[in-house]
Each structure stands twice: as structure tokens, then as C-alpha cells.
């Protein structure tokens, strides 16, 4: 078999039907749209209209809300911090905070603070100051001989 010998399976694709090209074509004049009415015009389909049936957006109940005061943290894993230390982007002897992580390119956007997650391994002794951390992250940092100070999100924002 050669690339130039490959063919589609029989019946796997149909030719496009050109509508409105003369009565003799079988799809001329009205082009398979019937006669007049909304569906014969262009720009049909009323969004969300289901033919008179109660539409799904009205059948389902309204639920929940978006809390405008909720804090949104930028998450960073221990594995990424360790990678940055190994690459020489982060100084392990200095305190690692949100500004240091941003400067090193570990995080892109600083939202309401940084939250450290326990994904990956940490082998270097570090001092971290962030808005929050998960329990596994705290355990891994302390196991590596480091310390972590968790600030409030408001305190980190003001820095």
C-alpha cells in the first residue's frame, strides 16, 4: 500500500448538494426549504426555542450564586518550586514569597495570594511565606527541614 493509493471507504462521504440551482436539479426554486414562513428565510432558529415545549433553561431550577467577595488564590505545587530552585531561578536561602515566585516565573498572575499544594517532592530546606498551604504541603516542607508561614490573603495583597 502506498500513500497515493489510499482511498476513502465506499459510501463514507457524500457529495455536497448545491441547492437553488434550477428546477431540473431537483433542489431548485425553494432549495428544499418548503414554501414561505420563518424557516424558509435566512437567520432562522430562535435561540433556546424548542417548538413550544418548555425549554431546558426554564425546566431546570436556578441554583447557586457567585460570591463576589470570595478569595481566588494562585496555586503552585511544591514540585514546581523545587524545579525552580534546581534551575537556579529561586534562591532557597532567601524567603520565598509571592513576589519571588512571580519574579522567578513560577506563577504568572498573582490573584488574591498564593496557595501552595503538596504535588511533587521538595528536597531543599526552604522558608516560604504565602497566603495558604494544604496539609500535605506543610508536612512535606517541614519534613525537608523548612518552615512555612501562612499569611492572610489581605496581608499578602498589601505587600
UniProtKB/Swiss-Prot annotation:
Species, as recorded: Allorhizobium ampelinum (strain ATCC BAA-846 / DSM 112012 / S4)
Quaternary structure, from the entry: Part of the 50S ribosomal subunit.
Function: Binds to the 23S rRNA.
Name of protein: Large ribosomal subunit protein uL15
Family annotation (PANTHER family): 50S RIBOSOMAL PROTEIN L15, LARGE RIBOSOMAL SUBUNIT PROTEIN UL15M
Composition bias, Gly residues: 21-35
GO biological process: translation
Pfam annotation, one family: Ribosomal_L27A
Keyword tRNA processing: no
Disulfide bond residue pairs: none
Record-linked NCBIfam families: rplO_bact
Assigned keywords, A-Z: Ribonucleoprotein, Ribosomal protein, RNA-binding, rRNA-binding
One of the record's GO cellular component terms: cytosolic large ribosomal subunit
Listed GO MF terms: rRNA binding; structural constituent of ribosome
Biased composition (Basic and acidic residues): 1-18
Amino acid at each position: 500500500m502506498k500513500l497515493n493509493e489510499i482511498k476513502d471507504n465506499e459510501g463514507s462521504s457524500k457529495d455536497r448538494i448545491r441547492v437553488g440551482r434550477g428546477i431540473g436539479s431537483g433542489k431548485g426554486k425553494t432549495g428544499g426549504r418548503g414554501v414561505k414562513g420563518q424557516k424558509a428565510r435566512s437567520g432562522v432558529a430562535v435561540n433556546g426555542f424548542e417548538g413550544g415545549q418548555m425549554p431546558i433553561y426554564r425546566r431546570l431550577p436556578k441554583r447557586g450564586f457567585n460570591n463576589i467577595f470570595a478569595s481566588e488564590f494562585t496555586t503552585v505545587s511544591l514540585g514546581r518550586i523545587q524545579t525552580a530552585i534546581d534551575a537556579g531561578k529561586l534562591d532557597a536561602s532567601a524567603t520565598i514569597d509571592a513576589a519571588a515566585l512571580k519574579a522567578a516565573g513560577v506563577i504568572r498572575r498573582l490573584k488574591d495570594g498564593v496557595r501552595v499544594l503538596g504535588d511533587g517532592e521538595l528536597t531543599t530546606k526552604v522558608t516560604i511565606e504565602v497566603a495558604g498551604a494544604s496539609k500535605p504541603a506543610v508536612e512535606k516542607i517541614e519534613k525537608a527541614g523548612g518552615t512555612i508561614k501562612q499569611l492572610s490573603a489581605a496581608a499578602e495583597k498589601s505587600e
